């Protein structure tokens, strides 16, 4: 792992995950229930976490080549992720970037 990625992970762990972050504590204790599911391209320049600057637990994210959503077909990773998000977490909005 390159030094800058490792440093970023260590800062995240110290400040967000292990720090005194009430949002993270709440998500750990009560579970996650994001309102959004974002489907985006695998393009490294278009990262939803960077673009929207969300708080932890704001959305689920799925990356697909070209942000292409194929017809529903059980057994695909996107179908499984959408099923989980909608059925168990009651996601209200799906965004395709």
Region roles according to the model:
Residues 1-76:
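Short, conserved "active-site rim" segments that organize catalytic pockets and cofactor/ligand binding
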Residues 53, 84-90:
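Alpha-helix C-terminal capping segments
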Residues 72-86:
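A short mixed-secondary-structure module that forms the rim of ligand-binding clefts
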């Amino acid at each position: 792992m390159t030094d800058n990625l490792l440093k970023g992970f260590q800062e995240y762990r110290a400040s967000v995950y292990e720090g005194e972050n009430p949002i993270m504590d709440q998500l750990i204790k009560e579970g996650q229930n994001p309102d959004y599911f974002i489907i985006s391209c695998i393009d490294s320049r278009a990262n939803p976490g960077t673009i929207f600057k969300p708080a932890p637990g704001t959305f689920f994210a799925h990356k697909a080549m070209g942000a292409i959503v194929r017809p529903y077909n059980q057994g695909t990773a996107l179908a499984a992720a959408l099923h989980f998000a909608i059925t168990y977490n009651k996601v209200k909005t799906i965004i395709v970037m």
